[in-house]
């Protein structure tokens, strides 16, 4: 192997190691949940009556053994990956029963107009990607219509 090829291979290897280390230490900045765990309107887009409704429904559903369904609105997630942000939020906040893994996070990001529904593995048979996709499409259509 020529010196040029060895140097090139060494450079590529060093860049690969650097990239892996940067990715491994990339931190997603997750806010703390509010005292009203089921509704976290950091974008200030939900009126107080609707917040109260979501909170009371979430509390009652959880008290009756149902999964925890949490709503989070953010103005921005500062360039973070939507999926990574939602997964890390669900983990940090401990959404759902740990053993049943039955939490649901509904995330709305205002600046990018993204909606994501993060579903714990314990609910994927009931709330699969297809159902979540239809819900998001219907919600998007309703929001667009005003």
Q: PLM features: residue spans?
A:
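Bacterial N-terminal signal peptides that target proteins for export
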Residues: 1-12
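Bacterial N-terminal signal peptides
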Residues: 10-21
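Folded, non-transmembrane soluble domains that reside on the lumenal/extracytoplasmic side of membranes
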Residues: 25-146
């Amino acid at each position: 192997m020529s010196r040029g090829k060895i140097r090139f291979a060494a450079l590529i290897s060093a860049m690969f190691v650097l990239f892996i280390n940067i990715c491994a230490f990339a931190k997603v900045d997750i806010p703390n949940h509010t005292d009203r765990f089921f509704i976290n309107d950091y974008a200030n887009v939900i009126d107080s009556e609707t917040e109260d409704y979501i909170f009371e429904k979430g509390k009652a559903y959880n008290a009756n053994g149902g999964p925890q369904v949490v709503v989070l609105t953010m103005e921005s997630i500062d360039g973070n990956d939507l999926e990574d942000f939602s997964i890390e939020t669900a983990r940090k906040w401990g959404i759902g029963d740990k053993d049943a893994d039955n939490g649901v996070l509904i995330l709305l990001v205002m600046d990018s107009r993204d909606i994501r529904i993060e579903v714990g593995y314990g609910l994927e048979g009931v709330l699969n990607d297809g159902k979540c996709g239809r819900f998001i499409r219907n919600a998007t259509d309703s929001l667009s219509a005003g």
